[in-house]
Amino acid sequence: MPYRLIKKEGAARRGEFQTVHGTVQTPAFQNVATAAAIKGGLSAHDLKEIRAQVMLCNTYHLHLRPGDKLVAEMGGLHKFTKWDGPILTDSGGFQVFSLAKLRHITEEGVTFNSHLDGHRIFMGPEQSMQIQANLGSTIAMAFDECVENPATYEYAKNSCARTARWLLRCKDEMNLSLIHISEPTRP
């Protein structure tokens, strides 16, 4: 997904990048569809009418409900939402931060207690990429840890280093996932 710079003025810049689901002009507002539905009842048609470019869906929440495997069986998020434009899925990393009282972080990944029913869930870089591949994401984000504020310098430094290591694992897993997706159905 090469980025093309169109114009720059001071620190501001305008550009675009191509995806298999269309061109994205930047900067871009991403319409949030946490559970694959835009709040306020906007449809895919409505999004086109307001010239929306990207739908942002939440990996963690979709993994829990309705389930990434069910979404895959239904043809992926594009068919599930009837949206043919680019879909960005977050990694689940924000939940590492937002569910702080319900999680345990290790080098392997994060163990959560579901906010829905308390059952234990493990998500690491590989699982995050597998879930995003199941969802049929156009733009998949690498699994990361959002550090709390305030945090000690040492904690932030260690978290940043762990996130960089997780990025390499995400890249390896995504490359493996793409091998198993045939070109015509590739997200």
Predicted regions: what is each one?
Residues 1-177:
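Non-catalytic, usually N-terminal nucleic-acid engagement modules in DNA/RNA processing proteins
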Residues 177-187:
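Residue-level detector of conserved catalytic or cofactor/ligand-binding positions
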